[in-house]
Amino acid sequence: AFMALMNRVFQPYLDRFVIVFIDDILVYSRSVEDHAEHLRITLQTLREKQLYAKLSKCEFWIDQVVFLGHVISKKGIEVDPKKIETVLQWQAPTNVPEIRSFLGLAGYYRRFVEGFSIMAGPLTKLLRKGVSFHWDDHCQQAFEELKRRLTSAPVLTLPSGRGGFVVYSDASYQGLGCVLMQHGKVVAYASRQLRPHESSYPVHDLELAAVVFALKIWRHYLYGETFQIFTD
């Protein structure tokens, strides 16, 4: 209810210079001048709606912020170091609920890891109905590789304006993968495992499935844009 209220209050400014999550308000701008105006509008809106922010919990004019498990700065977006520390300390799962917990945390940052779903395959297989839990060398290797990739995750660029998007997609009988780039910098990675019926597809159909997957998952960036897409 409170989240819905905040979204209504800031609806004219959402995704323009304001992001709201429950009672957290993030104001972002491209220049100092813009930021001064955006802050004025945000604070004035709160005042008009008789909503009050506690000064001790506010931070103003910062060039880096931790928000929803990410560090956002002018360099781009990266994984919160505190979350990386949690990943490093994670012990190998000994049952299905522990696998779910690990994949829940790791999956939250899947956009930072190229081929995440394919890499996690040995772990997700243990989540299937009727499959007995057996942690073998393939599972351990996948677990360690996911931890390594997450703890060395790259800084992803934040999309800037319109145009310049390029999509690279690929497919194999292990899964589908794609990369979204803008002006030569990585915006996000995406991947998924094959669905049961797709395992019988010829390779060229899988390549097309990867293209469709990329266009669907990044449609909010690509809709109405002219862009390039490369596939095998």
Predicted regions and their residues:
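Short, flexible loop/turn motifs enriched in small residues
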Residues: A171-Q174, Y223
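Two-metal-ion RNase H-like nuclease active-site motif
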Residues: G164-A171
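Active-site palm subdomain of RNA-directed nucleic acid polymerases
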Residues: A1-A36, F116, K216-F227
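C-terminal reverse transcriptase regions that engage the nucleic-acid substrate
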Residues: L5-R8, L14-R16, F21, I41, ...
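RNase H catalytic domain
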Residues: M181, S191, V212-D232
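A short, polar/acidic, helix/strand-boundary loop motif
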Residues: A1, Q182-A209
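Short beta-strand scaffold segments in enzyme catalytic cores
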Residues: L176-L180
